[in-house]
């Protein structure tokens, strides 16, 4: 990640909308509706699997660790993080990201101020930020 992006995020509260394939990061208390950065999961090379099965099963999780590692590196400079995910249970990438943090980045895990679920694929950046602010307020910040 570029240093200028990390400097924008450093010691600020941020929102991260995390899906299976990418995460967008905004400053929580900023008027801009444009994400500060995006982290994209590398497409795994799937062998012995039909194209229709790409996102089903274990092969789709191959590139998840490097994706979560890069996202954690970006968020590690923030003071507080609100995570917004899409879906429930194992399909919610936020839950899997938090599990990753529990094992690999406990200090960052402690700065997760709030989490939530929303239909982020159908929401604009502004709507995601507003939802994150609601979650932030509910968490007494």
What are these regions (language model features)?
Residues 1-141:
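Terminal alpha-helical anchor/extension segments at protein ends
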């Amino acid at each position: 990640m570029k240093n200028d992006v990390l400097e924008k995020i450093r010691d600020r509260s941020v929102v991260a909308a995390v899906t299976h394939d990418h995460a967008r990061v905004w400053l929580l208390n900023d008027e801009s509706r444009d994400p500060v950065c995006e982290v994209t999961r590398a497409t795994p090379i799937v062998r012995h699997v039909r194209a229709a099965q790409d996102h089903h099963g274990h092969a789709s999780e191959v590139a998840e660790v490097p994706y979560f590692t890069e996202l954690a590196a970006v968020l590690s400079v923030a003071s507080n993080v609100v995570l917004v995910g899409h879906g429930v249970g194992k399909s919610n990438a936020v839950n899997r990201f938090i599990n990753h943090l529990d094992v690999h980045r406990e200090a960052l895990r402690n700065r997760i101020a709030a989490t939530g679920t929303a239909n982020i694929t159908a929401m604009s950046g502004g709507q995601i930020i507003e939802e994150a602010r609601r979650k932030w307020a509910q968490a007494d910040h």
